């Protein structure tokens, strides 16, 4: 079947069929009405395990991705995140940006893509996750019908650990109105017991709440930035912590001083029991609201099962 035929089969019943990649997973997913479960599973199985990747389709999609790369490179507030991970994971796969380079994309042939999918798209390397009002026995029956012909093979997902972290400072000159700044370091991996505590501290420091310490210090009190945030990313074997803000060039040094001041205060000042309780309450509330989104909920649980 042509790609359009597959997409149209889902669109015709108001469903959504999509995919995305990050640095450790590829996700193919669908959202649909309960009555279209079998149609969705049949299409997903066909896409993941039976795609043929004709060369003309690869070449067409390559140009789409190159357009995306060019658009991305025009946005320094996004590009800086890739530059940051390239620095802290220097000469390591985690330091490479997900979209890749145009010259590499144009070199791909059908057999390259098929070889990759045969190697990694294996039952032992995947999870199949369904969320909704379904009978479990029906799910098993349909999975056996559409997914049972997949040959199993041993998959080695081991990668070389990132090299020892060496602090760096990088300045990239660009003709923009704003200075885009990122400060960060390595963080905890997804299995580290200290990760949850760091997520809580990160939320207090520069999480999505308007009352985060950095947002109050840089935006609410002084109006120096439009956006300031801190982020913690946990991979299976390492992690990354970063603070980002965009500001006028003349305000950059002031913002840096204020940021370091908040970091020092957080390091040196113990949270009171009431502050800790409030921080936990806020994070629990944010998790609860995010869980109301079925897509976030399903993808989050599937990732938990995978790792």
Predicted regions and their residues:
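Charge-rich, well-structured scaffold segments of protease-associated domains
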Residues: 5-161, 171-172, 176, 181, ...
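Active-site SXXK
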Residues: 1
């Amino acid at each position: 079947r042509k790609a359009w035929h597959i997409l149209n089969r889902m669109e015709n019943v108001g469903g959504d069929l999509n995919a995305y990649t990050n640095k450790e997973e590829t996700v193919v997913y669908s959202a649909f009405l309960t009555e279209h479960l079998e149609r969705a599973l049949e299409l997903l199985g066909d896409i993941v395990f039976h795609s043929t990747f004709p060369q003309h389709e690869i070449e067409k999609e390559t140009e789409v991705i190159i357009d995306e790369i060019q658009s991305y490179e025009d946005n320094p507030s996004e590009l800086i995140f890739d530059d940051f991970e390239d620095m802290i994971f220097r000469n390591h796969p985690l330091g490479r940006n997900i979209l890749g380079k145009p010259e590499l994309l144009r070199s791909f042939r059908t057999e390259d893509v098929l070889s990759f999918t045969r190697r990694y798209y294996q039952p032992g390397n995947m999870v199949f996750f369904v969320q909704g009002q379904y009978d479990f026995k029906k799910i098993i029956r349909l999975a056996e019908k559409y997914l049972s012909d997949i040959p199993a093979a041993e998959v080695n997902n081991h990668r070389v650990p990132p090299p020892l972290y060496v602090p760096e400072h990088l300045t990239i000159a660009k003709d923009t109105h704003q200075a885009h700044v990122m400060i960060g370091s390595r963080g905890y991996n997804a299995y580290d017991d200290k990760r949850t505590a760091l997520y809580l501290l990160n939320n207090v420091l520069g999480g999505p709440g308007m009352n985060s310490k950095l947002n109050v210090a840089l935006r609410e009190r002084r109006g120096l930035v439009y956006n300031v945030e801190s982020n913690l990313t946990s991979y299976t074997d390492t992690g990354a912590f970063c603070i980002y803000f965009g500001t006028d060039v003349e305000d950059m040094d002031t913002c840096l001083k204020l940021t370091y001041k908040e970091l020092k205060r957080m390091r040196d000042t113990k949270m009171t029991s009431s502050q800790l309780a409030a921080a936990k309450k806020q994070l629990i509330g944010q998790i609860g609201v995010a869980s109301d989104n079925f897509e976030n909920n399903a993808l989050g649980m599937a990732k938990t099962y995978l790792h």
